[in-house]
C-alpha cells in the first residue's frame, strides 16, 4: 500500500509533537501551511492557550499582501516578523519551533528565519 503525501505529513507531525512541548517559559511556535495561506501561533501547551498569533488573513497585514499574494515566501516572512513582534510585546523571547509536519523548506523556512531576525529565539 502506497503512503500518500498527506499521510506522511501527519505521521511526521505526530512524531514531532511527541517531542515538542510548549511551556509558559518557552511556548511553542506552531506553523500551519495551507495552499493559499500560512498561520503561526505561539501556544502554551500547559494551559492549552494561544498567547499570540498571526496569519495571512490578519486585517492589519492585508495591505502587505496586495502585491505579493498570500502563498509566497515573502508573505510567510511578513507573518514571521509579525508573530515575533507580537510575542516580544507579550514578553515572550524564547519559543520552541513546531513546523507542523511540513518540511523545513520554502514558506515554513521563510517564516522561521524572519521570526529569528525579528528577535525571537529558537
From Swiss-Prot:
GO BP annotations listed: translation
The protein's name: Large ribosomal subunit protein uL18
PANTHER family, alphabetized: 39S RIBOSOMAL PROTEIN L18, MITOCHONDRIAL, LARGE RIBOSOMAL SUBUNIT PROTEIN UL18M
Cellular component, GO, one term: cytosolic large ribosomal subunit
InterPro entries: Ribosomal_uL18_bac-type, Ribosomal_uL18_bac/euk
Pfam families named in the record: Ribosomal_L18p (PF00861)
Source organism of the structure: Synechococcus sp. (strain JA-3-3Ab) (Cyanobacteria bacterium Yellowstone A-Prime)
Annotated keywords: Ribonucleoprotein, Ribosomal protein, RNA-binding, rRNA-binding
Annotated SUPFAM superfamilies: Translational machinery components (SSF53137)
Xref: NCBIfam families: L18_bact (TIGR00060)
Function of the protein: This is one of the proteins that bind and probably mediate the attachment of the 5S RNA into the large ribosomal subunit, where it forms part of the central protuberance.
Highest taxon in the source lineage: Bacteria
Database matches in HAMAP family: Ribosomal_uL18_B
Single annotated GO MF: structural constituent of ribosome
Gene3D superfamilies the record matches: 3.30.420.100
Family under the similarity heading: Belongs to the universal ribosomal protein uL18 family.
Oligomer status and interactors: Part of the 50S ribosomal subunit; part of the 5S rRNA/L5/L18/L25 subcomplex. Contacts the 5S and 23S rRNAs.
Amino acid at each position: 500500500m502506497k503512503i500518500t503525501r498527506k499521510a506522511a505529513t501527519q505521521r511526521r507531525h505526530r512524531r514531532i509533537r511527541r517531542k515538542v512541548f510548549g511551556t509558559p517559559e518557552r511556548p511553542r511556535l506552531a506553523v500551519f501551511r495551507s495552499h493559499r495561506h500560512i498561520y503561526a501561533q505561539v501556544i502554551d501547551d500547559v494551559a492549552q492557550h494561544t498567547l499570540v498569533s498571526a496569519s495571512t488573513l490578519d486585517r492589519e497585514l492585508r495591505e502587505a499582501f496586495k502585491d505579493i499574494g498570500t502563498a509566497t515566501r515573502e508573505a510567510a516572512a511578513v507573518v514571521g516578523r509579525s508573530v515575533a513582534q507580537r510575542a516580544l510585546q507579550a514578553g515572550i523571547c524564547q519559543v520552541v519551533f513546531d513546523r507542523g509536519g511540513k518540511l523545513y523548506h520554502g514558506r515554513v523556512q521563510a517564516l522561521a528565519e524572519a521570526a529569528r531576525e525579528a528577535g525571537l529565539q529558537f
